[in-house]
Amino acid sequence: MFPRRLDSPAAYGIAQAMMDGFDRHYRLFRAESARAKHRFETSDWSGQQRAQRERIEFYDLRVKECVRRLEKEFSAGAQPMDVWHQVKLHYIGLLVGHRQPELAETFFNSVTTKILHRTHFHNDFIFVRPAISTEYLENDEPGARPTYRAYYPTPESLQETLVRVVDNFQLQGEFEDLARDAGRVAEVMRPRLGPAKWRANFQIQVLSSLFYRNKGAYLVGKVINGFQELAFALPILHGTDGRYVIDAALFGEDDLQMLFSFARAYFMVDMEIPSAYVQFLRSLMPRKPRAELYNALGLAKQGKTLFYRDFLHHLRYSSDRFRIAPGIKGMVMLVFDLPSFPFVFKVIKDYYPPQKDTTREQIKGKYLLVKQHDRVGRMADTLEYSEVAFPRERFEDDLIAEIEKFAPSQLEISDRDGDGNVEVILKHVYIERRMIPLNIYLQEAFDAGPHDARARQQMERSVVEYGNAIKDLVAANIFPGDMLWKNFGVTRNGKVVFYDYDEIEYLTDCHFRRVPAPRNEEDELSGEVWWAVGPRDVFPETFGPFLLGNDAVREVFMRHHADLLDPVFWQSHKERIQAGHMYDVFPYDPERRFGAGTGSPA
């Protein structure tokens, strides 16, 4: 029960200190995001990547700062629960009129759960459900920048309006030919709008901040005509002479889903009201969960909060049971899923086969590397949780036995809260979007037979995509380590994505070598490796026997990606990366580009 009176001075002080902590966090987060504009204008690509990586750490640092302050100034952990009841009510009062209330609620949860015992992790003490609506949040102060701007072109002035749209972002520097680029956009936009008459409400709505990532800046908006809405994004790059160009025009939900993919690095966006940006983006991509949109904007903790709420909602309205995930079992990770839920859950095992020379901390380090690195659309993002409780009755007994056998240190089965509900509590778990394992996807094509044209096309496309995925990883300075088909998955849009991270290394840390010539006949006939191998030595010529046992797969692979079996390919990329070169990886199909000769946004 909430108190009828707010009579604790300490409660208000704690609430205000937490609000101060959040405001400091978002001020620093927003300032770093806003600096992306200058880094883009000055072609500071290494600085952009470094900022993207470092910004991820901001949140946890501010939470730790706030916890230390609360303990030092208020002995927060020793305060009675009636004070903590009041803390939440005071905090809700401070949120009235706040422009990031949903983020501030999540920050409150992060701090409070570091101080209180988990028996108090319910809505009386933390924000299990949001308390403040984010609907129609605006900054009404004079001179405040709106979330989006609306433009009203005529059929004759479309090109001119597009020039004005881009000009309003006030990028420092020159375009090669903005009128030309706007004309190209208008030319491809008109067919997308179809033959319909331009209605009275025809307008172009554009978000007020550009979206920065790596070498690119993206203008994001939509065209409204009558009841029709057309989402679009325009990538702005530096051309070969350093001047700006609009490289492509992306239209529709599928193009934008690729741009905002869970397998890509987070954007830098200067947002005062992030919920308004998310609401606008949801109108462009209605199938994309809000959790993933917050993630894409760099607000990963809010993404985790929304994901967990969605997950609890799904549990309430489903009845199937968690099971061991289909497919080949991993040597390092124990994977399970809920068939009706489009994600998989991964637990690090307690022990591994001898060939896996690793530790739990090393594996966590690999997953952190992926979180902080540019994923170039080829590595799935992960959500990391601790002390996650599931209803015991929703687990198949085989799965419980599997966890007890391979990860007993991570498992607790108890009524820890004393509420009569027995739970499965996992100490540490990663959650990833479910994909079709590539080996299973290929097997489906093989099972259809060699004369099935669609199956043949599926096989060819996935083998080509597999090679493209590896090459994109190489461009991002990532060596996947274990390149077996089972460690890659196929997304809903047919993209091949890597998701097994326990053996990944920076490409620049590896040594790519040729297999030495046999010294004698005994070496030549030996089935064992007879030459000396260092800890990070890689022999690309040896990949073939593990990957290309199927003749049809071998033919397609050798036609498109034979260079992956040549050490020269790997070594040349390594040397160029060491020399400071950043490879170009596009988050959209090459045929969307207006012309060659520009750098990549990625």
From Swiss-Prot:
- Keyword Hydrolase assigned to the entry: answer is yes
GO CC annotation: cytoplasm
| Reactions that this protein is recorded to catalyse | L-seryl-[isocitrate dehydrogenase] + ATP = O-phospho-L-seryl-[isocitrate dehydrogenase] + ADP + H(+)
GO molecular function annotation: [isocitrate dehydrogenase (NADP+)] kinase activity; ATP binding; phosphoprotein phosphatase activity; protein serine/threonine kinase activity
Keywords for the protein's UniProt record, in alphabetical order? ATP-binding, Cytoplasm, Glyoxylate bypass, Hydrolase, Kinase, Nucleotide-binding, Protein phosphatase, Serine/threonine-protein kinase, Transferase, Tricarboxylic acid cycle
Where is this chain's protein located in or outside the cell? Cytoplasm
Q: Sorted alphabetically, which InterPro entries does this protein's record hold? A: AceK_kinase, AceK_regulatory, Isocitrate_DH_AceK
Q: Which GO terms describe its biological process?
A: glucose metabolic process; glyoxylate cycle; tricarboxylic acid cycle
The UniProt record gives the binding positions of ATP as: A325, P326, G327, I328, K329, G330, M331, K346
Q: What is its main location?
A: cytoplasm
Tell me which EC number(s) this protein carries: 2.7.11.5, 3.1.3.-
- What does the record give as the active site? D381
Spell out the family assignment given in the record's similarity comment: Belongs to the AceK family.
Q: What does this protein do?
A: Bifunctional enzyme which can phosphorylate or dephosphorylate isocitrate dehydrogenase (IDH) on a specific serine residue. This is a regulatory mechanism which enables bacteria to bypass the Krebs cycle via the glyoxylate shunt in response to the source of carbon. When bacteria are grown on glucose, IDH is fully active and unphosphorylated, but when grown on acetate or ethanol, the activity of IDH declines drastically concomitant with its phosphorylation.
Q: By what name is this protein known?
A: Isocitrate dehydrogenase kinase/phosphatase
